[in-house]
Amino acid sequence: MDLAPSLETELIDPDEAEILASFRALPTEDDLPCDDGEPMETPRHREQMNLLIDSLKVHWADRTGYYVGGNMFVHYDPENKRRSRGPDFFLVLNVVDRERKSWVAWQEGMRFPDVIIELPSDTTRAVDKGEKKGLYEGLFRMAEYYLYDPWSQEFIGYHLHGMRYHEVERDAERKIYSTATGLYLGIREGWLRWLTVEGAVVPTPLELAEQAGQRATQAEQQAEQEKHRAEQAEQRAEQAEQLVAMYRRRFGDLGGGREQEQ
């Protein structure tokens, strides 16, 4: 009979073992709701959310160790599974790459989002600017919090300095730099977009496909133009040969005639 203590018994004292057992008994994403089942306020809100998520994934196609989601629950209180928030967009850095039904902080080593973007509406604006801001600042200790109203285009950003959020002043082009992503956030054609440091809009997969199609069309048009120019040059050469032949038939070898005259 093996009476040797287990590795866990050797390394963990009784109090820690009790805490660990309690932690293991906590609900996981499989036990918790992933969202509230309510659709986003308007189709424009959903399209705005998808723009932010899809374009960042494209920009970071070769990057690993992050999670980006939207309109799904972030569970933050292990003692009360009903305490959760459903940010319209959130980003967590330096985490395991995998799909998730919801973000469960205690299942992720008490990791909270690094960036949240809320898309206020008439019914959520007060909560987004008040209660949620206080939660993200005080409990999440989240570095960057942004609010963008897809209809009024009101855009506000907060960065955490010390223990408090400070509103970020937009630059001359009315954009804000996100340290977490290395990108800017700015309004382009009525939408909040990720921008490179050079000012280019980070495209979505659809926009990338459209750009590729435009490049292919331009290349095809250029090839057709070059073919047309080549055909025109060939026609001019043929016309020149025909003109020379006509002169020779009418006047003979002009060069030979000049030699005889000399």
Segment roles from a protein language model:
Residues 1-41, 55-58, 74-87, 92-140, ...:
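C-terminal interaction segment
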Residues 41, 45, 49:
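Nuclease catalytic cores
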Residues 48, 64-66, 87-88, 113:
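A generic secondary-structure signal marking the coil-to-beta-strand transition
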Residues 62-74:
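A short acidic/basic microdomain associated with nuclease active sites
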Residues 67-69, 146-149:
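A structural signal for short, well-ordered beta-strand segments and their strand-loop junctions
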